[in-house]
Every structure is written in structure tokens, then in C-alpha cells.
């Protein structure tokens, strides 16, 4: 959102509107203004030869206004799309947390992006308490066990369990054999 404002406009463009419906209404309003300016530009340019039109200050000012309106519309479209995407993501995350299944938001966003692009990279995480959800199936997540990152390939059977269950923190080397104890005593 900040990138769009930096590139195309200013905070004055938003005029204190911060909800999605308000931003969409503002976008529609700016699109109408842009269409009206384009019509005015066509009317002003109609019938004039190119050389005569270049020297006309009124026409130049109109062109500047059209360019400014186009930049504002582009910025608003980017902002509205980002806000819409954020609200969808937030609604899904809220629904997930209402079911008492904790999922690390950063890990979840990374997995979602990889699902969209079709990428399959190993994702490293310290979040052992994250509940495995169906979106994670097919990915390899490296879970920290206190010392190293243990790669865990997520299968359908793991859904509902925690990531930490599959990355043991202790190494069990087995019970000592009884024959060794007996030999020591003798």
C-alpha cells in the first residue's frame, strides 16, 4: 500500500477512507472523473491541427490533469486490491484461530505464496506449536528442535497434529544391554 502511494500519489488521495467499501467508492468516483477529463480532452483537441494543439496552454493543462487522474486511479486500484487480499487472508486466519488451531501467520503466508506459484522449497521455522493444516500437505518444513532444523515432509495423516511432534528434541540411543552390567559387576 505504501509503495503504491509513494509511486502514484499521496495520503491526501485516500481522504481518511480506510475500509474496503469506502476505498472502492473512491476508486469509482476517480474513474468517473478520469472519464470526464478524457471526454473534455477529446472535445478540446477535436478539429485542431497537431501544430496548433501543441501551443495551446489550456490543452496542456488538461493533459496534465488527465495524467494525474490516471496515476491516482492506478494507485487506488493497487491499494484496493491489496486491502481486499489482506481482508480475505485475515478472515481465513481468524476463522482458523476460532477453531483453536494455532498456525504461525508468517509460516502460513509463506506456504500460501508457494501454493499460488507452485513452488516446493524447504521452509524453515521455529514454530513447533503450529498446527498442521491441509494447505501444508506436500510441503517440506524444516522444524527447529533446539539444535538443528529437522526436515519434515507433510502428509495427509499429519493434519491436525503439531509440527513439533515430528521433530524430536532428544535422541534416544536405546537402553544399555544387561550383559554389559553383569560383566562390570564380576
From Swiss-Prot:
Stretches the record annotates as Small ribosomal subunit protein uS19: 96-186
GO cellular component: cytoplasm; small ribosomal subunit
Residue span of region Unknown: 1-95
Entry-linked Pfam families: Ribosomal_S19
Keyword rRNA-binding: yes
A biological-process GO annotation: translation
InterPro entries the record matches: Ribosomal_uS19, Ribosomal_uS19_bac-type, Ribosomal_uS19_CS, Ribosomal_uS19_SF
Recorded GO MF terms: rRNA binding; structural constituent of ribosome
The keyword RNA-binding belongs to this UniProt entry's keyword annotation: yes
Superkingdom: Bacteria
Record's keyword terms, sorted: Ribonucleoprotein, Ribosomal protein, RNA-binding, rRNA-binding
Similarity field: Belongs to the universal ribosomal protein uS19 family.
Functional summary from the UniProt entry: Protein S19 forms a complex with S13 that binds strongly to the 16S ribosomal RNA.
Protein name stated in the entry: Small ribosomal subunit protein uS19
Species this chain originates from: Aquifex aeolicus (strain VF5)
